[in-house]
Structures are given as structure tokens and as C-alpha cells.
């Protein structure tokens, strides 16, 4: 079985997280298993379901500049304890630079950056996020995006593959009983 480490901020019920769960619920989990590295110390909405589907959830330090020394220490230990991960797939846009850098240093052969945004929030990490955006191509060896604009934004070129977001269409089929309510 192949285990893929999905890197996210958390697994609360939001757009990216729900899309990942749609994929996860529908893959052949006998052949491929998703595990999740989150950046929140507390349990998220989907954690119990992930475990029930055979996945694992790891809690890394938050990606705040003051936590970077602790983050790098955590990730160095994480990769030393988990050599089973040969594929890491990061969904945290320009911040993917940090986990993918540590994965590269640890010798993880497949490092995927996945762009889901077309801009960077102008928060206190704005300058760092811009710098990380310029470094992402040096640490990721596969580039994915949910759309062309998101890909061009993060990678600053056309060297990426577009994977449209997964939507469970059955949730949106007409249902007379639901309409009656």
C-alpha cells in the first residue's frame, strides 16, 4: 500500500478540506492511503472520519514565524520517524515551501505543491509568503493547481497540471423529499 502525506492547515469543514475528503472517501484505500499533517494543535472536524477510514492525523506546530525553529525541529524528527512516506502533497500554497523543504532535505522523492489560491492574504506573514512563493519551484518536483490562474500565481509559469476540485455531485441532485422540507 502507498501512503501519501497530505499537508494542510487543518481538517475543518471548509472548501479544500471537503474536496480532499471527497477524494479520500472514493479512492481505493486498499492500494492508497491518505494521512494528514495539520498545523493546528487541536482536533479538527474530519479527524475522526480520517482515522475511521484508516488514515493518521499528525499535529505539527503552527506556521508562525516565531514557531519556525520548533517547526523545523518537529519536521526533522517527523521525517526520521516516518521513512514510509515517499510522497508528500502540500495544499498550503506558498507556505508549502516549509514542509516541502524539510521533505526534500529528508530525501522524500515525490514532493507535490498544490495551488488553491490566486493571491496572498496581506497579513503579518505577507512578505514571508511572497519569498516562499519564489522558492516553491526549488523544493517541489510536481506542481498542481485547481485552475490555470492558481497555477500561474504560485509557480509564475505554465509548468503545472490542473486538477479540478472534486465535487460529490450526488449531494446536489434533486430530491423531492428535501424540497418538501
Segments predicted by a language model, with ranges:
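A conserved, positively charged/aromatic
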Residues: 105, 112-146, 154-155
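Short beta-strand scaffold positions
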Residues: 90, 145-146, 162
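Carbohydrate-associated surface elements
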Residues: 149, 166
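An amphipathic, basic-hydrophobic alpha-helix
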Residues: 52-56, 62-87, 97-101, 105, ...
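Short His-centered aromatic/hydrophobic patch
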Residues: 90-96, 115
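N-terminal strand-loop element at the rim of the active site
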Residues: 2, 6-70
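A short helix/loop element that forms part of the nucleotide-sugar donor recognition site in Leloir-type
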Residues: 75, 173-181
Amino acid at each position: 500500500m502507498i501512503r501519501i502525506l497530505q499537508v494542510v492547515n487543518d481538517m475543518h469543514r471548509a472548501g479544500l478540506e471537503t474536496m480532499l475528503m471527497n477524494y479520500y472517501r472514493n479512492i481505493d484505500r486498499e492500494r492508497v492511503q491518505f494521512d494528514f499533517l495539520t498545523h493546528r494543535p487541536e482536533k479538527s472536524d474530519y479527524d475522526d472520519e480520517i482515522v475511521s477510514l484508516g488514515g493518521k492525523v499528525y499535529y505539527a506546530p503552527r506556521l508562525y514565524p516565531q514557531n519556525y525553529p520548533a517547526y523545523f525541529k518537529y519536521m526533522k524528527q517527523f521525517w526520521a520517524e516516518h521513512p514510509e512516506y515517499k510522497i508528500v502533497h502540500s495544499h498550503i500554497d506558498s507556505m508549502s515551501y516549509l514542509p516541502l523543504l524539510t521533505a526534500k532535505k529528508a530525501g522524500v522523492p515525490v514532493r507535490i505543491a498544490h495551488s488553491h489560491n490566486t493571491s496572498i492574504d496581506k497579513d503579518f506573514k505577507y512578505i514571508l509568503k511572497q519569498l516562499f512563493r519564489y522558492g516553491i519551484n526549488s523544493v517541489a518536483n510536481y506542481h498542481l493547481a485547481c485552475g490555470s490562474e492558481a497555477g500561474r500565481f504560485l509557480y509564475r509559469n505554465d509548468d503545472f497540471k490542473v486538477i479540478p476540485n472534486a465535487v460529490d455531485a450526488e449531494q446536489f441532485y434533486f430530491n423531492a423529499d428535501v424540497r418538501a422540507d
